Amino acid sequence: MFYSIVAIFVGAGFGALLRWFLSIGLNALLPEVPLGTLASNLIGGYLIGIAVVAFATRAGLPPEWRLFVITGFMGGLTTFSTYSVEVMTHAVQGEFGWALAVAALHLIGSFTLTGLGMWTARAWLAPA
């Protein structure tokens, strides 16, 4: 149990730091669509697609690696709560078009990149 807790804790820290760096670097570029949050969710969607397939095909890996990557790192990197606030801020200000655009970008983009990540992992991990 101790190693599981440490794996999640460390992974979440790294994921949160990456999210913070992305926000610092990208959010000011287009304030209507905070690109740092979008990048966090899209990158996270792609990486979790890879991770799910990789862990499913590598059953011998210690469970702490899955906890580190999926529960910790992806949990720290991706952010539904920030996304929700950004969408609702537009809606409350009467900017319904922006609210819909931000919501659609995150949802469609994340689903697309998760599928692409799964496809990538299957291609990489396919028997030669």
Curated annotation (Swiss-Prot):
Membrane topology per record: Multi-pass membrane protein
Enzymatic reactions: fluoride(in) = fluoride(out)
Domain of life: Bacteria
UniProt KW keywords: Cell inner membrane, Cell membrane, Ion channel, Ion transport, Membrane, Metal-binding, Sodium, Transmembrane, Transmembrane helix, Transport
Activity regulation, per record: Na(+) is not transported, but it plays an essential structural role and its presence is essential for fluoride channel function.
Presence of the UniProt keyword Nuclease in the record: no
Subcellular location: Cell inner membrane
InterPro entries: FluC
Binding of Na(+), residues: 75, 78
Assigned protein family: Belongs to the fluoride channel Fluc/FEX (TC 1.A.43) family.
Function per UniProt: Fluoride-specific ion channel. Important for reducing fluoride concentration in the cell, thus reducing its toxicity.
Protein's recorded name: Fluoride-specific ion channel FluC
Source organism of the structure: Burkholderia mallei (strain ATCC 23344)
Lineage, highest ranks first: Bacteria, Pseudomonadati, Pseudomonadota, Betaproteobacteria, Burkholderiales
Name of the coding gene: fluC
